[in-house]
UniProtKB/Swiss-Prot annotation:
It is found in: Cytoplasm. Its EC number is 3.1.1.96. This is D-aminoacyl-tRNA deacylase. Coiled coil: none annotated. HAMAP family: Deacylase_Dtd. A Gly-cisPro motif from one monomer fits into the active site of the other monomer to allow specific chiral rejection of L-amino acids. GO terms for biological process: D-amino acid catabolic process.
Length: 158
C-alpha cells in the first residue's frame, strides 16, 4: 500500500460535479494498493501499522510552531482518495504500466476496509472519494507538507 499524504487547510472530492466528501484542516491521502498486497492485506499487521503511522505522524504545528502534533491530537479531518496510479511503472517506454497495481476488485475491498478502519479510529472525521470514479479533488495545501508512506518500508508486503 502506498500513501501520498498532504497536510491541508481544506480538501474536497466531487464526482460529476456533485460534492462527495470534504474536510477542513487535516490530511488528504491518496491511496494505492499493489498487486502483492492481496485480498487479506487489510486484516494484516502491515496495513494496520501503516494506518497507525499515518494517524500518528507529527506533522501539525504546536503552539510554538514546531511540527509536534498528530492528526489524532489536532482533531483534524482525514480524506481518503483511491489512486491506482501510485503503482505506475515508467521503466519502459513513455506509457506508464499499471501491472504492479492490485486488480480493481481486490483494491476495492482493501480500500473499503481501510476507510472503515480509519473511521473507527477517527469517528466522524473521515471522508472518502468514490473508488474507480473520475474525481475532481480540490485542496489547499498547508505548508506544503507532503509525505510518501509505503507499507513495504514499514514491514509490509509492497
Amino acid at each position: 500500500m502506498r500513501l501520498v499524504v498532504q497536510r491541508v487547510r481544506e480538501a474536497s472530492v466531487a464526482v460529476d460535479g456533485q460534492a462527495v466528501a470534504s474536510i477542513e484542516a487535516g490530511l488528504l491521502v491518496l491511496v494505492g494498493f499493489g498487486a502483492a498486497d492481496g485480498s487479506d492485506f487489510a486484516a494484516g499487521k502491515p496495513c494496520r501499522a501503516t494506518l497507525e503511522k499515518l494517524l500518528d505522524l507529527r506533522i501539525f504545528p504546536d503552539e510554538a510552531g514546531k511540527l509536534n502534533l498528530s492528526l489524532r491530537e489536532t482533531g483534524g479531518g482525514l480524506l481518503l482518495v483511491s489512486q491506482f496510479t501510485l503503482y505506475a511503472s515508467c521503466r519502459k517506454g513513455r506509457r506508464p504500466s499499471f501491472s504492479e497495481a492490485a486488480p480493481p476488485q481486490v483494491a476495492l475491498g482493501l480500500y473499503n476496509a481501510l476507510v472503515e478502519m480509519a473511521g473507527q479510529a477517527l469517528p466522524g472525521r473521515v471522508g472518502s472519494g468514490v473508488f474507480g470514479a473520475d474525481m475532481d479533488v480540490s485542496l489547499v495545501n498547508w505548508g506544503p507538507v507532503t509525505i510518501l508512506l509505503d507499507s513495504a518500508d514499514l514491514g509490509g508486503a509492497t
